[in-house]
Structures are given as structure tokens and as C-alpha cells.
Amino acid sequence: MSAGRLWSSLLLLLPLFCSKSSSCGLSTHVEIGHRALEFLRLQDGRINYKELILEHQDAYQAGTVFPDAFYPSICKRGKYHDVSERTHWTPFLNASIHYIRENYPLPWEKDTEKLVAFLFGITSHMVADLSWHNLGFLRTMGAIDFYNSYSDAHSAGDFGGDVLSQFEFNFNYLSRRWYVPVRDLLRIYDNLYGRKVITKDVLVDCTYLQFLEMHGEMFAVSKLYSTYSTKSPFLVEQFQDYFLGGLDDMAFWSTNIYRLTSFMLENGTSDCNLPENPLFISCDGRNHTLSGSKVQKNDFHRNLTMFISRDIRKNLNYTERGVFYSTGSWARPESVTFMYQTLERNLRLMLAGSSQKNLNHVSSPSASYTLSVPYARLGWVMTSADLNQDGHGDLVVGAPGYSHPGRFQIGRVYIIYGNDLGLPPIDLDLNKEGILEGFQPSGRFGSALAVLDFNQDGLPDLAVGAPSVGSGQLTYNGSVYVYYGSQQGRLSSSPNVTISCKDTYCNLGWTLLATDADGDGRHDLVISSPFAPGGRKQKGIVATFYSHPRRNDKELLTLEEADWKVNGEEDFSWFGYSLHGVTVANRSLLLIGSPTWKNVSRMARSSHKKNQEEKSLGKVYGYFLPNRQSTITISGDKAMGKLGTSLSSGYVRVNGTLTQVLLVGAPTHDDVSKMAFLTMTLHQGGATRMYELAPEKTQPALLSTFSGDRRFSRFGSVLHLTDLDDDGLDEIIMAAPLRITDVTSGLLGGEDGRVYIYNGMYTTLGDMTGKCKSWMTPCPEEKAQYVLTSPEASSRFGSSLVSVRSKGRNQVVVAAGRSSWGARLSGALHVYSFSSD
């Protein structure tokens, strides 16, 4: 078959294979398996399983997708649906372990090694599906974006995850051939069922369809990014990071099942507890406190059929125990993928060459800091303070995804000390700088940071959030650790105070803030978790612990001991997603964002259950502490806008008048773009509102608005005000971390990101980005004093940012959360220096 004919066949096959079938998720499962292997270390036993799997990637990758092979109707009209269903549960793993131990004693030959690698891939799929389908991700996605419809989220999420994977991640590790241990699988199924339930031809045909689909996804699936981004902002924002069922959480659970599988392969199952749900397997005498449930993961099928033509079968190579699938010439570099990449490069060069250089663009940072550890999430959160009391600002950076071999996502915090020149003006690998390291498996230490004097000894202390502590028990309670400062300017090497939460899925420490909560003029510790139950489901919790000199060393506190605590008002409203403290007329005002608030009370009065105008409006609450009743409320007015995702405040001149302002981000707000006489909707382009904080007014008055200029850019998802030119006014800094450079928003390019800096002297009333000299609106660049552009494509430049002040200069540090400069998706920090000239 020619490359063109096969390419056409793949385009036809993809929608048939994926539409409304839970057999999709091939790219997602392959990516999970790849990440799980990165930090795998199984110390006990006679076999180096990591080396074995690395040697047999062809079998391992095929195994990560295999359990879904027989679900879709395209596979023999769905006749073997039950075979796929049974492959997802512990009895299949148990049968496989016994089969290998009975038939293939150590040392193993190569075919048996491939069988073992294939089995490891299957176990990854098992536990990943449970987190994705049954426990966490899709259920929350349904609640947030699909009116509590799990089935709608399921339909969009399975294939949408593949679209997002292909758009955001580089699959250059994908093996060009796969191996399926056909003979061994047939015998395992015979043992599992006690009879013959499937034939060799069915097994080969249906797994080969998976192989073709996986490589078909590599060609064109990423071009559907805009479709699935529009359907579900939650999918785009939480796909990798969500605490229960996000990619990294599924990779963590894969490493757990690998440890158990290796133990059973070498020692048998007699010392193991094997419930039907593989998440609850244990071989150490301990079991999880949660009870497992078996939920059938497939609900949708079509009566479709397809056969594999004879001329495609020439890419199958049978062996005594299995079959190899290969791509042939159609997937080589000169294929469609290569043509897409070449077209993208040429268009980028053409656009760059034809456009006049913008004088306000800053494309080169003064320094960049990286890590050589993949998936570290460097710069997930940052703060600055003079920790060593030398008069210079220091930079504190969280990397909650940092891992060691055998210690997945324990997390780290890095401290970079400033001097007369500010932060070090050279590129750094931060592993050589000051470090605090987490100690709980997948605890994600470093997810939140706050600097305050918690024990009031005159020295700055550091609070660090680890919201996924307890993930190994499926409780995700979370913890906050406080490290006391010392006279030597260094922090304690171990936490002096630990604050914990007893509620399942509490996620304590997701956000931290230092602000004066009791009116004594000293900062106190504010802790929030938008995912905490709050009495029901993800209402969110915000709590405050006052700083005082009676704080003891090695103190253990619980959330119930908080001095001040407030819950969200609606399920899945994510109260506490953002926090900001500000002083207004000598009173402490705590602002709390609830971006997925949807006005349930008004929805209940509506005659339409699915009122499109009520979803994720967002809301901001303002509390004059220590009052527990909100005095200020600001509500969103646009469905899916998520007002309150970000908050910041400062002083600027508005039409020449000095004004204390509050900025509120709505990064998934839709806007209208005008291009000459044409108009189009900028879905999730993002907007920011600027309000006046006036002591004589009960509610803040809206002054100005800012809007992004690209679809899906999330303009305003990060906000910051700081005085960069020492004129007594704050500059307004806004980030659009998902901004795609080309106007097609997904057909070419990736999530590059961009940061805009507006001079605080020149803000005006009304639409700041709508009055444009150019032929296109909005125009966020025109009024900006500086536009920081990403030095790396597809890096989510602007995922977080912070300002650092020293005696000699003011600096802005911008994180690129998906940078691969140091290692794959490890993150990077870029430093920009500004003077008062």
C-alpha cells in the first residue's frame, strides 16, 4: 500500500476508532508509561526491571494501551468487549503472574522478557484508568465543565487527552515497532476464563488497529486542539497536574503497581492481598483504608466494522510466541509529520521576516535558571524576600514535581540569594543552589510558598505547601511545613512546624499567603485548598494561623486548630484558588478567588437545567479580617470566564489620579476580536478587570479592562503589581502563558506564552486594550511599555512570575513551566532586569 493510501485510511480510521469509545487515550497511556519509567527504581530482587523495560520498549508501549484493544466496535463489532473489561482488573494480573512463574523460570529468555515488559505496561494502564475514570479526573471535569455529566466528560476527555498530549508533548520516544506476545496472551486468557474466549486473529487484528491509531494520532490529532480546548478548559489546565488522575498522578500510581508486580513475579502472590481493584493490592501486610469499587469503564459503542487489508499486513512479522508491528515507510521523517514541522518552521520565519520589529519587545533575558531533572515543574510558584537579611531580595522557587529514582514527585524548594547586582547574572543549574527537599512520596512539596516571621523572633521563616501528602493512601490530605530562620541567615534543614488536615482530598497547602490577619501589624499564615471538601465536594477552605512568639519547635498543628476558617459556598467552586492580602484604610483585607463558582441558586430557579450562562462565572470574596463575613463580592458575568483565578493590587495613576487598585483575572473569558471589518470570538483569550479600592466605597468600582489577543491564551492568569522604575507607582504585569504565536491558535505552533508590562503612570479608564492603532483589536501590546517574549517555543512562558528588589536594580523573574531547556518539561526561570532610567 502506498503512503498516501495508508494515510487516507488512517484519517478515516481515527474517528471510527475513537468516537465515543473509551478505547481512546492511547497517547495518554503511552505518555504515562514513559513518565513512570523515568524514575523507576526497584531495589529488591534479582532483576533490573527498569533495564528490562528500556530494552523492550516495543512490548512495553504496546502493553500500556492493550487493555482497551477489544472495546471499540471497529474491533469485530465489539464482540470481545468483556475481554477488554476483564483485562483491567486484578484477576488478569494474578493469572499473568501465575502463568509466567509456572512456565518461565529464571533466568528469562528474550521472549519472556518481552512478555514481562508487556505486562508492566498493562499494569500502568490498569491503575491509570481507575484514577482517570472512576476516582478523580473525569468526574471533576464533568462537574466543572459539563453540568455534572460524567458521560459527556468521558466522551470529550478520553480522546481530548490524546489531542492535548500530541499538542503539548514530544513523542520522539515512540517506538516505530510494537510487539504483542500473542501466544502467551491466549494462554493467559484460557486460564483466566477456564475456556477459549478469543482467537489469534482477533487479538492480532485489534492490537494492530491500536498500533495504526497511535501512529495516526502522531500525524494530525494535535490539530484538533482548538476543538477540545473550547469544550473543556479544565482538561487543558489540569491534564498534567490535577492531584487525582492527572498525568503525573497516574504515573505515580504506575510506579506503585510496578513495585508490587516485580515483587509478585519473583516471590509469588501468597503474601499479597489481591482485591479486584488493582489500586488496593498490597504485599506488605497493609492495605488502603478506602474501599475499592469496580466500575465498568466503557459505556459507548457504535456498530461499525473494518478489516485490515492484506497489503497492510506486510508490516506484521510473526515469531514463535508473538508478533511485531512496524510502521513501514509511511512514518519516516519524510512523512506528513515532517512536512507539518517544515511548514511550521517556514511560516514562523516568514512571519518574523515580514513583520517590523516591535521596539517594546524584550526577547532575551539577562539570565536563565534550569534543572536537569524532567517534569520538575520548576517555577510552579515563586516568592521573594530578604531571607538572609543582607538588604538584597532573594528568590524562593518551588519545584513540586522534582523526583529522585524511586522517589517520585517528592518536590523541592530552591533559594537563590541576591547581591548588589541582584540575582546571579549567569545561567545556573539550580541543583547547585540552596535546597529544601520534600520527604513524602508524591507529596509535591513546593507547591506553595510564603515568607513570614511565624514565631516572631525577628527572623524570616518559610512556609512550604505539600498538598498531595497522603497520595499513597489515596487520601491526598496535604501538609504545610514551616522552616524557621536563623541568625546565620539560613533556614532550618527540617520543618519546625507541621500543619496537617484529616479530611480526604483536603489538599492542604495548595495556596499560601503571608498577610496581617489579626491587626497586630505582623504577617500571619493563610492557607487555602480549593479542592478541599468543605463539608461536601470541592467547596474549598481558607484558614489562618496567627504568628506569635509561643510557637514551639517541632510543633504539630491541625487545620481544626486554625484561628480563622471559612468554607466555600458551592460544590466545585474552588474557593481559595487564589489569595491576596492588602491594607485598605489601615484595615487588613483578605481577597479570596473562587473561579469555578457558578451561582447554583440562580441555576436552581432557571427553567433550563443546563443554563449556558451560569457555568464557571467566578467570584471574589473580600473579608476585612478578622470578620468571617465577606464585605466585598465581585461576580463574573461571562460563562466559563473564571473570574478570580488571579488577584493583585497596588498603586497606579488612572487618568492622572493616584489610585489604589485591585486587579482580578478572568483568563478563560471570551472576547470579540475585530480584524478590519471582520469579527471573531476569542474563546478563552482572557481578560483582566481593574477596580478601585476606595475606603469610602462598599464595593470596588470598575475602572478599566484588559483583554488578550489570541484564543486560548489565558491572558490575565498571572497578575503582579510592583514598582520597577522607582517612581512610587506600580507597574502592571500580566501574563498569557498559553498564548500561541500564530493567529490560527493551534494549527501551527504551541503554547509559547507572553508577558506584558504596563507603566503605572499611564493607565486610563475604560478598555485599555480596545483602542488600537493597528487594524486588529484587542491590542494588549500597544499600551504595554515592555512585552517579554518567550525564548523557547511551547514552554508556557509566564506560568508564574515574581519581582525581586535589590539595592542596585529591580528584576522580574518569569517561569516557563513547560520548558525543556534543562530536561524534558522540567521548567525554566528567566530573569529580566529593569532600571529607574
From Swiss-Prot:
Keywords: Glycoprotein, HDL, Hydrolase, Lipid metabolism, Repeat, Secreted, Signal. Widely expressed. Residues 1-23 form the signal peptide. FG-GAP repeats lie at residues 364-425, 431-492, 494-554, 561-619, 629-689, 701-767, 785-837. Its EC number is 3.1.4.50. One of its GO terms (molecular function) is glycosylphosphatidylinositol phospholipase D activity. This protein hydrolyzes the inositol phosphate linkage in proteins anchored by phosphatidylinositol glycans (GPI-anchor) thus releasing these proteins from the membrane. This is Phosphatidylinositol-glycan-specific phospholipase D.
